[in-house]
Amino acid sequence: AFADTKPQLEGEDRKLLNETMRDYRRAGLALPPAKRKEVEQLRKQLAKLGTEFGTNIANTKEPVVFTKAELDGMPEDFFTKPEIKTGDDAYTVLVNVTWQFVAVEENAKSEATRKRLYIAHDSLAKDKNVPLLNQMLTLRNKIALRLGYKSWDDFQTEPRMAKNGAAAQKYIDDLVAGIEPKFAAELTELQKMKQLDVQPQGGGAFTAPRINTWDWRYYQNQLKKQKFAVDTEALRNFF
């Protein structure tokens, strides 16, 4: 092969050769035929499971029915949409329809409503997909090991700036540490808003109520309205 002649290349030519040889190795071309075929089969299995995983989510229709009172805070035109109003004081939200899910999470005043919808959304196709996910993780590890990597993390990050999983994790850890003060300040603002909902009469010490995963969109949206006069629902009309 050309690479075996160890050509004296420089600059872009050297970079092109190195990256081409790396990609060949990542594809398994340096392996004996039997092991290369095994990696190819593992990759096909992984791709098939990935497609099945996404299809399961796309095909799962998870309707969650609320009363109008439970959806207090939603813009009035939400209730008039034919796909939403499905009965006498019955309003059906499909959690796999992104605009419906986000609209409720951003605007519904009731934490119980937001929580119920979020859990349904986070559980889409769970019974089918959790076993698939475990299989996919196993296949990823097998592929990485067959190709000579310590882990899937190292395999995935090799062609990127980080080069390995440990460096990528350090970057994330450093990033988290760097933004922590700003994050803490913004979180406190959301907590103050939630405390007003928990203790509407005010008074008492600041208790820093927990901002759950079904809370942040709502309080962030309220903060935008109060501080910047940004109405997310009104903006949707332009997109």
Where are these regions (language model features)?
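Extended, charged alpha-helical coiled-coil/arm scaffolds that mediate oligomerization and mechanical coupling
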Residues: 7, 12-42, 46-53, 57
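A conserved hydrophobic secondary-structure block that centers on an alpha-helix together
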Residues: 28-42, 122-155, 163-169
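A short, ordered amphipathic alpha-helix with a cationic face
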Residues: 7-15, 107, 129-130, 143-145
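Active-site-adjacent "gating/activation" loops or surface patches in catalytic cores
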Residues: 86-124, 211, 215-221
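Active-site-proximal, well-structured secondary-structure segments within enzyme catalytic domains
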Residues: 12, 16-18, 45-48, 55, ...
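Short, charged/polar, low-complexity loop and linker segments
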Residues: 24-27, 117-120, 226
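Long, charged all-alpha helical bundle/coiled-coil segments in cytosolic proteins
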Residues: 1-6
